[in-house]
Amino acid sequence: MMTKNPMQLKAFIKNKAAEKHISAQLVMQNYMLERLLERISLSPYKNNFILKGGFLISAIVGLDTRATMDLDTTIKGFTLTHEAIRKIFTEICNVQIADDVQFEVVGISDIRETDDYPGIRVALKANYPPISVPLTVDVTTGDMITPREVEYTFSLLFDDRTISILAYNLETVLAEKLETVLSRNIANTRPRDYYDVHILYALRGAECDKATLRRALERTTQKRGSGVILTDYPEIMKEIRESDTLRKLWEKYSREYEYAKDISFDDTCNTIQTIMDAIMA
């Protein structure tokens, strides 16, 4: 989208934020991530990047239903090194689009080993002076996608058009979230994991193939060494339901995000239990 000046862009952002009941900062962040994603889709690396995580979930269910601040991707066809990623992102930043935005790579660092997948974190800036928005892109490799990635049609925030990008299929998104919730048990401090499972299943559950989801979950737990959750999930869910800490974290989350305010912690637990009972029967 071309705008006359940065003030006009800010006005568009403010209106969209009011319409979707989320902060203008979140809308700006998502707009700039979208601008980066379009550059990836027009780059020679279009078929090497696979979109996953919060930004994909937001695209599936709607920005007013799930917001995120960063971009998660997995890459194929490349060895994951700082040098390779810097070169790739420098080229992506140099893709010219008529949207007034210029990107720059600020830094490259390793993702902590404690995260689900080790990988590389790319810090960037999206500039439309005087607007400057810091962005983070996480890049992993070797992710288990079952059965395979799909071509996802991504609708743009302000333009009446779409871009095409490779992405996780729905079953793999759900499998990773289920594994995270169950394997971390009461040690999980991220209410959004519960929300993601609940909202994805509520809005897209009918499109989810149960056999594929089970296989995706089995392969994810195999990769992460957490296969015990497949048999122990009833006991794990009992512990989760009885955790005062998790309930308080959920209550805080549902107060902070308008889209979660009418969903209870029990609702999310019931959804997880329903999915697990259905696929493990």
Protein language model features and the residues they cover:
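Structured mid-to-C-terminal alpha-helical surface segments
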Residues: 1-49, 59-67, 71-281
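Catalytic metal-binding/acid-base residues of hydrolase active sites
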Residues: 56
